[in-house]
């Protein structure tokens, strides 16, 4: 927790931080984050673990691409010139998402080198539910419009179960800590920029704050929770797989999103045939699957789902 900091660095960043507090970096925060960040200004005094500290640096860590886990970085000093780093990850109390734009790169940063195994173990654990899903929608069904053909399923991390294709991630306590803290982040996100200076491990959070009603810096300090403690009390992380569909009447799909499970469409004996692929999580994206599907639809003279019938459908997963 305690670190040694060269006084020159602290003095050198002071003016820079004052400029940044009112600048464009603040625009990256949501309203609640911005308000909380505004409480943690240079010179603010607070008590922590029975000692009084004064903030000598406070800002949002940034990097060239993506985001660190730390939302608010605080460097503070006590009367013995001992410095302490507090690195807060802020989460809204009612937020369901932990990660909603999962890519292979992001998965590795969350789960480490075994990320593919982690995701495949999770999706195959509910393989029977995937087998029950409709793939071709000749008619509107529940929330899926007529004309949709499924390309695969995106992968999201949640605080709770969400939908039919959802379940608890198979993770150790240490892996859950890694997800919340960002221990597996790439170097540019771990060693993020704070007030214009690269600070080692500034992007790796050590506290989590889930209370947006705080009104003072002391309340922030009092209500933040060590990530290890938070994980002990909330050890579950859930995943949800959300369908990416090709809308045949519009000839569109919602972007080139990485897919945790893909539908490998092909043509066999004059019929459009699907096969679900679980062992290439997030390595195949929506564009590739859509282009393959469209190629076989063209070969079979299928323009939209109105053209699909018993003669050219190689699956009964049609509604």
Question: What is each stretch, according to the model?
Answer:
Residues 1-25:
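N-terminal amphipathic/basic-hydrophobic helices that include classical n-h-c signal peptides
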Residues 42-78:
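A short acidic/basic microdomain associated with nuclease active sites
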Residues 258-319:
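Charge-dense, extended regions
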Residues 27, 44, 48, 81-284:
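Catalytic cores of nucleic-acid endonucleases
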Residues 21-42, 62-65:
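A short, highly charged nucleic-acid-interacting micro-segment common to nuclease
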